[in-house]
Each structure stands twice: as structure tokens, then as C-alpha cells.
Amino acid sequence: MAKSPAARKGXPPVAVAVTAALALLIALLSPGVAQAAGLTATVTKESSWDNGYSASVTVRNDTSSTVSQWEVVLTLPGGTTVAQVWNAQHTSSGNSHTFTGVSWNSTIPPGGTASSGFIASGSGEPTHCTINGAPCDEGSEPGGPGGPGTPSPDPGTQPGTGTPVERYGKVQVCGTQLCDEHGNPVQLRGMSTHGIQWFDHCLTDSSLDALAYDWKADIIRLSMYIQEDGYETNPRGFTDRMHQLIDMATARGLYVIVDWHILTPGDPHYNLDRAKTFFAEIAQRHASKTNVLYEIANEPNGVSWASIKSYAEEVIPVIRQRDPDSVIIVGTRGWSSLGVSEGSGPAEIAANPVNASNIMYAFHFYAASHRDNYLNALREASELFPVFVTEFGTETYTGDGANDFQMADRYIDLMAERKIGWTKWNYSDDFRSGAVFQPGTCASGGPWSGSSLKASGQWVRSKLQS
């Protein structure tokens, strides 16, 4: 329902390739120090690329007393600097970089942890580490046991740890819910991009690192408009860019919704042939991945549910021929309002479901516009069939205007209760209130937190981190 921006036109720029995500234990307090202080610091390399890497910093308090403040000091080799930090205060002097707790994580109770992280510019890894003045590598040779360079255990082998894809595996529909590879209901939460024809420059290595490692998202929705200077103007260019973005998200362990963003015209049949061509190639290329979901019609409008259903039953087989077991999300009547915006509701879908398996139905809402009747429709639908909220905002349906966080919290609570996945609109610096970043943030390369965030950005980041 959100509108296109009044400015910012143009074709997608070339993407920067990224490497697969890595994990590396940089520093751990030595056993002797741990017995004396009981405070450990672990730095884990989460992802790397040609000119840098991102890392998380975890401080653990294994004492019987509360730690009121912590300080981690890392020494980086010449040519490597800290470009961005989250959940910590950062100062530097020469090659020494000091990270201290902020208001919400400086105090650590017994048995508790505090997490932060940074993005390094340059490939050099820490050569020395201290936690509250005690050397992290005391008693260990650099690169030896417990010292810098020691690989950490594979996160995927530890229940509840690792990237979202490592935790949940290939998701599937089970009954009325989305489940992990073991059949346990799971809620995936994350962000939707804006149209990549306008805001592709907001999707960079550093912004996606922030989304994955600082914001703690599980999933990203890649929104590719078909009209409005979108796919129809350059099918090859937009398809190639979607391949790149899928790979970039995959490298960070994120799930991906490939969003065929129809809006105007609202009849999905208008773009049927284009959809078949696009999804045939996307499914063929990415069928072996465990993290890709397909959203085949963003916001159908002005057409009946029967028409939307017939469209879905033509596109789904194209995907299934190439990718037989990934989740497919079908847009619903009335701008994916489950029909509410056009005087209907979930019952029409339940009475005439799409003839396909492992599918879900999309619901979109904008909290300042869509009140209790929409909330009740979501509640009703979640009892009838699988629903994924692939787009929502705290503002009005225009993507702009005042935020209604109180109403948005009611939706968030229901979605948490029913384990309904969601992606918020939108991860860009559009001038409208629905965009999470202040205008100019993307062109400046961040930062992707703090003063760069609008109110809606602060709100959703806190939801994802909780």
C-alpha cells in the first residue's frame, strides 16, 4: 500500500560480491584469569569480504556478583580500523580500540552476557585483547589454544545459536504455521527493502551486515517493482541484481523473500508472462538454497479472489518444476489485506484456497490506518490458514504520516502469540516516515543505527533485538 517516492529514479547499480559467512574465535580469557575474574570476552568473525569483516563481541559474567561496567580493548594491525560499532561506546588511540558498555548492556548479572559488535575496514584481525584490564590471551600463544586465531565451534552445531538459517534450516508449512526443518513452529522477523529501482544504494555489505548482526533480523524481503521504472524496463538487469542480493543475504545466514512487487495495475494477470519468466530463472538458480521464499504477487487490488487464485495456480507450477519444496507466499485481495480493504475477509480464502501445498497467504497493514477490523481479520486468518505479514508499517497506508506505535504493538503482540512472521516496510532512507533511515544515510554509507534512525527505525530495531 505504500506509495513510490516522488524522486530517485534509475537502474540498479552493480553489486559488490561477498564471500560466505565465516566464524572465528578471536579472543577468550585464559583459564587462570577466568578463575580470578570470572569475566570472559569472545570476539567472533561473522562475515568477511574483500576489504573488511564484521564481528560480534560477547562479554560473559561467570562470577556470583553483578558486573557494573565492562571494557574490551582490541589491538588491530596497521591498515585495519573500526568503521562502525553497535551496542557499545568506541574510542581509539593508534591501533588500540576500546569498547565499553552502553546504558542498556553495561551491567551484567551473574551468568549473564552483553553483546556488541563492529565492522572492520581492512582484513587484519585483532592481535591482542583485554577484558577489564586482564589480557585475553594470557598463557596462550597468538593463534594457539584460547588465543587470537582459534576457530570457534560451528554455530550450527549448537542449538539456539548461529545464523537464523543455521538455527531453523529449510522452513516449511505445517498446518496453519511456518515451521523449522524439524516441524517446530517458528516466527521469522525482519525488514522489507523499498523498491530496488530507487533505493538499491541502501543495500550494501555494511547495511546488510548491520541488519543481520546488529538489528538481529531473521529475514529480508527484496522488493522488486514490476512497473514504476522497475523490472519491465530492464528484465535482465533487475533479475541479475536479485540474484546478487539473494546471494548477499544468504552469505549472512538470512532468509530471503523474493517479492514480485505488483501494485499498479493491481491485476496480477497483467504481468503473468513476466512472472513466469522471472520465477523460472530465480527458482532454477536458487533451488539448492535452504533460505529462499517466493512472494508471487505483492498487493493484488481491484480484482476478485478467484482471479488471484487462478494467477497463483499458473505461477506456482513454474516454481515447483525447479524448486519443489520451498515456501511460496500468495498475495490476497484488497492490497493483501485478506480482502478487508475491499469489503471481504479471510473466509473467502478459506472457502476457496489455492490448489497447492507448502504455501502461505500474505497480509499487509499500516497501523495508523488499519484498526481493529484488520487486526481481527489477521487473528481470524491465523486460525484458518498459514499467514505471513510480508509488509507493514507503523504509519498510514501511504507509507508516510504520524506513527501509531500503540496500535503497532498490538499487532506485534498478536504476531508473537501466533508465531506469524513479519517484515516491516522499509529498509531505506526515503523521506517518508515509514523508511527507517534519515534521508542521506545510504549515500553516506551509514551509520545504520543511532541518530541515523527515524522513530520507526528505532522502534523496529528494538523489536528485532528483543
Curated annotation (Swiss-Prot):
State the species of origin: Thermobifida fusca
The record's EC number reads: 3.2.1.4
Return the broad EC class.
Answer: hydrolase
Give the record's pathway.
Glycan metabolism; cellulose degradation
Active-site residues, record numbering mapped to chain: E299 (proton donor), E391 (nucleophile)
Q: Which reaction does it catalyse?
A: Endohydrolysis of (1->4)-beta-D-glucosidic linkages in cellulose, lichenin and cereal beta-D-glucans
Please state which protein family the record places this protein in: Belongs to the glycosyl hydrolase 5 (cellulase A) family.
SMART domains the UniProt entry points to: CBD_II (SM00637)
Q: Does the keyword Signal apply?
A: yes
Disulphide-bridged cysteine pairs: none
Query: What terms describe the molecular function in GO for this protein?
Result: cellulase activity; polysaccharide binding
Task: Write out the ranges of the annotated region (Disordered).
Answer: 129-166
Kindly give the SUPFAM superfamilies that the UniProt entry links to this protein. Answer: (Trans)glycosidases, Carbohydrate-binding domain
One of its Pfam families is CBM_2
InterPro entries membership = CBD2 (IPR001919), CBM2/CBM3_carb-bd_dom_sf (IPR008965), CBM2_carb-bd_dom_sf (IPR012291), Glyco_hydro_5 (IPR001547), Glyco_hydro_5_CS (IPR018087), Glycoside_hydrolase_SF (IPR017853)
Q: Where is the signal peptide?
A: 1-36
A single GO BP term for this record reads:
cellulose catabolic process
Protein name in the entry? Endoglucanase E-5
Q: Which UniProt keywords apply?
A: Carbohydrate metabolism, Cellulose degradation, Glycosidase, Hydrolase, Polysaccharide degradation, Signal
Q: In what residue span(s) does the CBM2 domain sit? A: 37-139
